Amino acid sequence: MAVGRLVVMSALLVTAACRAPMPKGVEAVGLGGRALTSPALPPAIEADRLSKLASARSDLQRAPEDRDRWIWVGRRLGYLGRYREAIALYTEALERWPGDPFLLRHRGHRYLSVRAFDAAVDDLAAAARACRRVLDEVEPDGLPVPGRPPHSSLHFNVYYHLALAHFVQGEMQAAVDAWLRCLACSDDDESRVAVTHWLWCARIRSGDLAGAAATVQGVTVDMDVVENTAYHQLCLLYKGARTRDQLTAGEGSSGAAMRFGLAHHALVVGDRDQGEAALRALAADAGWASFGVIAAEAEVARAFTPLPTRDPR
């Protein structure tokens, strides 16, 4: 069996598992068969998020005709790691607003979280088609960074998550195409470095070494990046302005992004043993909903192929 099909088969098994009843606390099954349980949050953070969920539910009860109130309940569920509940809620909302790109974008994101990649592609591709008829608008930030305005938009999020869904299934050219569309929606440095990181990865894996080099050409040290510093530093690594030894991974989703970028870079520049070991370790990480961990799982499932034919440095 071709190794390129392994991640697809794993995703199909996971999708089937997503439709089946899960034990209490289990949100999904990882591509390697690991039971993925709701994360344990620090008590103060959990209490705050539960309070905000209760408030969002109350708002929805008062005005169920307001689509945005459905979205906020789904987002609040997601911040608590209750992804299957969020998916069910978005599905109910889509019965009221069929084909709504905002609802499809959020449900597609949560399908990604639970490893239902085919369902994610279906939702996000439908959202992308709907975006052709809908003006772009900035989305409010559910977990804002103090002093930083929201910067991602509907169109950005649709193409970003669609590209990631293709990437984790090994569909590199489709991922490149979606991230290029996403880059066209990016008008700030925070967004640009996030897209540039993934676009570089997809172009490298598709064998487009010249395209990968061109992707990071415009990245500079002095870009206005506060939130996505891991992506920024990784882009400088890809450009040759940093070495892996100079970069350190922190905690949380940002740390997972850095760990994936470092491991993936090691893999594609020829340090295969180091890259594979780091990706296997990341694939087993407790922070399983982060994109870095999802991408690492996918790399392990597809046995780390395909690889470029020569050193991209």
Regions found by a protein language model. Give the residues of each.
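N-terminal leader/linker segments that initiate helical-solenoid repeat arrays
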Residues: 18-72, 79-80, 305-311
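Short coil turns that delineate tetratricopeptide repeat
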Residues: 64, 98, 132, 153, ...
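Residue-level recognition of tetratricopeptide repeat
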Residues: 75, 109, 164, 201-203, ...
